Curated annotation (Swiss-Prot):
Induction (free text): Induced in absence of iron.
Record keywords: Cell outer membrane, Membrane, Receptor, Signal, TonB box, Transmembrane, Transmembrane beta strand, Transport
Protein name: Heme transporter BhuA
The gene coding this protein: bhuA
Entries under Pfam families matching the protein: Plug, TonB_dep_Rec_b-barrel
Annotated localization: Cell outer membrane
Topology class, membrane: Multi-pass membrane protein
Signal peptide (from-to): 1-23
Domain spans labelled TBDR beta-barrel: 170-661
Length: 661
């Protein structure tokens, strides 16, 4: 497509090569109005990994405020390396470089999250209304990122009272209301927060109510109505150099959905479905940490439920899944001359409960996994231009299946990333990791559809992963550019055939490169990203069947933000493009070619001078009403009498008013 060549060549010729820094934080010099300076490029900064400098993604609170995302598709709309499939909220699946997020260590406020339970549901995600920061560490993840980081890590961080309070105030509140066309309906968010005598607290509520949306051709897409009912509560207390944080998150989505939310089947109808998530955590840290004593202690409990218990034909769709995940982490960070070393232990137990259908006398199944690990990660900056992030962990994993058969094993993981900075403008880096994954259960929802004789293969073994990356960063006071090459391989994943749970014999692989760039001039920011990835199972391209590994081909984004201080206004736009995908393996499996698409989103925001605490915003998604399905969606095919994609929304306007007190 001509647009592809134009976008890539324009980005390359403008900036020579593209940046790893997808969302560089910007600091304005208050002495010189309008002057903007980007952070220096380096993989290590003040003892912390710079995720962006090695091809990852960081979304700051300012980035999220600009986007005002209604869902995770909009949250990652400016990142070509991250694809989100369409449909209603519970059906959205997040893929990083073509790998579903269950292949990464996902956490919310440091709390590990459960993997995707069923291949027809979406990824477990946090409500974007609660977020203040997102980090996506693609590829070789640090040892303290958590257990099972096969393809990297995703870290979501939610807001607290200290983030929202105005300077000098001890109480605040925020109210946001919006209405959207094309089924988006009404959305409301309220928050109250305060600070008194070392105690800070926050309570935030968010709800949505709408209808099924229509695609670009005007066809109603069943099962897509917004129906979120979410709560975030936090409290913190500081005393004598100690800090204790307690958090609770509650998520509910209850609406009529398709029986298989990620695909359209002939004669599809909707059925009641409820997806629920509860998370509680408590964390201890020090506010007066020293070089040798900077502890962090955290304990957590997660509950995930999936209820579809009144489907008309029990042998084909009645389904109840329940998961409980609880554990903790104890670590300390040591500061030395050239950096920091973090060491600790983490542990967790994951309980699974499923109902069953079919001709068997076992109505329910229960099984579990357990993990205990020790880790250390060092991050160093040396005077000679070298920086190093390296670490290791050792884990014990245990799996007890539904027949009370027990499997146990242990293994080591190592990682390292080395960089050399020639000067303040050029840095090269290379990194690698080998990760032991323990017993991976993956898409355990298959167990729901197996008879009483289903068992675990006695040779079932732990999974493993390898990651390699290398690249170059360039940067100046107002621009950044770079390229990252990546290669991720994952093996030993589960295979639920008709008789037993065993290991998938295939090695899954994602390899390619990412290009990203950013230029800032006064109040204007322009950015671009490009990702090219080849995703395979063994020697063959993966099929576009909404699985854990999906073909993404070529994807690109281009965005611009403009502040207009004289009028208290901000405007911006995002263009997302995906190239056509056609391969013989998909054709042989009766899939149609995936067409290219180009989607444009835009927004305008205004703070009325007479009401300084009010913000008015209008946004439009899919400005030109493109009829498309998002990359990593289940692609149309001739199978089962004709499978259709869950098409993305057509043109949608959103009108928002926000008050902050």
């Amino acid at each position: 497509m001509k647009f592809t060549r134009t976008l890539v060549l324009a980005s390359t010729s403008l900036l020579a090569t593209v940046a790893t820094s997808q969302a560089q934080e910007v600091k304005r010099d208050t002495k010189k109005q309008g002057e903007v300076v980007l952070k220096p490029i380096t993989i290590i900064s003040h003892g912390k990994d710079n995720i962006e400098a090695t091809g990852g993604t960081v979304l700051t609170y300012k980035d999220i405020e600009k986007l005002q995302p209604a869902n995770v598709s909009e949250l990652f709309s400016r990142q070509s390396s991250i694809a989100v499939s369409g449909g209603g909220g519970p059906s959205k699946r997040i893929h990083v470089l073509g790998m579903e997020q269950s292949n990464l260590a996902v956490s919310v406020d440091g709390v590990p999250q459960t993997a995707t339970s069923w291949h027809h549901t979406g990824s477990n995600v946090i409500d974007p209304a609660f977020l203040k920061r997102v980090e996506v560490e693609a590829g070789a993840a640090a040892a303290d990122s958590g257990f099972g980081a096969a393809a990297g890590a995703i870290r979501y961080e939610t807001v607290n009272a200290l983030d929202l309070l105005e300077p000098g105030k001890t109480f605040g509140a925020r109210i946001i209301g919006s209405y959207g066309t094309n089924g988006r309906g009404f959305s409301g968010s309220t928050a109250a927060y305060g600070l008194k005598d070392g105690f800070d607290w926050l309570l935030m509520l968010h709800g949505t109510s709408g209808h099924n949306y229509k695609n670009g051709d005007g066809t109603e897409i069943l099962g897509t109505e917004p129906a979120a009912r979410n709560i975030l509560g936090k409290a913190g207390y500081e005393f004598d150099g100690n800090r204790i944080d307690i958090g609770y998150e509650r998520s509910r989505d209850k609406a009529d959905r398709l029986i298989k939310m990620n695909m359209g089947l002939p004669g599809d109808t909707e059925y009641p479905l409820e997806v629920a998530r509860d998370s509680v955590n408590i964390k201890y840290t020090r506010t007066d940490a020293t070089d040798m004593w900077d502890p962090e202690v955290q304990f957590y409990y997660n509950r995930n439920d999936y209820w579809r218990n009144d489907y008309q034909n029990r042998t084909n769709g009645n389904m109840i899944l329940k998961e409980d995940l609880y554990g903790g982490k104890l670590q300390n960070t040591f500061t030395i001359d050239y950096g920091k070393i973090t060491a600790g232990i983490d542990f967790g137990k994951h309980d699974y409960n499923t109902d069953n259908y079919g001709h068997n006398d076992r109505r329910y199944r229960k099984f579990n996994t357990q993990q205990v690990g020790a880790f250390t990660q060092g991050r160093f900056e040396f005077d000679n231009g070298f920086s190093l992030s390296t670490g290791a962990r050792y884990d014990y994993s245990r799996f007890a299946d539904w027949n009370d058969e027990v499997f146990s094993d242990s293994g080591a993981s190592v990682n390292g990333t080395l960089s050399y900075k020639f000067n303040e403008h050029i840095e090269v880096f290379a990194g690698a990791s080998r990760t032991w994954l323990g017993y991976v259960l993956g898409d355990y929802g298959y167990v729901h559809a197996r008879n009483n004789a289903f068992y675990t293969d006695p040779t079932f073994s732990p999974g493993r992963a390898r990651n390699y990356k290398a690249g170059v960063n360039f940067g100046g006071a107002d621009w950044s550019a770079g390229i990252t090459l990546f290669d991720t391989r994952i093996a030993g994943l589960p295979n639920y055939d008709s008789q037993k749970l065993g290991n998938d014999p295939e090695e899954y692989r994602s390899r390619g490169f990412t290009l990203n760039a950013r230029y800032i001039w006064n109040y204007t920011t322009i950015g671009a990203t490009f990702t090219k990835a080849k995703v395979t199972a063994g020697d063959d391209p993966v099929l576009p069947n909404s699985g854990s590994f999906m073909p993404i081909g070529d994807m690109a984004t281009l965005f611009i933000d403009q502040e207009i201080p004289d009028y208290n206004m901000k405007v911006g736009a995002t263009l997302a493009w995906a190239g056509r995908i056609s391969d013989e393996a998909a054709t042989a499996a009766n899939f149609y070619d995936q067409p290219a698409y180009t989607v444009v989103n835009a927004y305008a925001e205004w703070n009325p001078p007479a009401v300084k605490n009010m913000t008015l915003r209008v946004g439009v998604e899919n400005l030109f009403n493109e009829n498309y399905y998002e990359r990593t969606s289940f692609a149309p095919s001739q199978n089962r009498g004709g499978i259709d994609a869950v098409w993305a929304p057509g043109r949608t306007f959103t009108f928002q008013t926000a008050f902050k007190f």
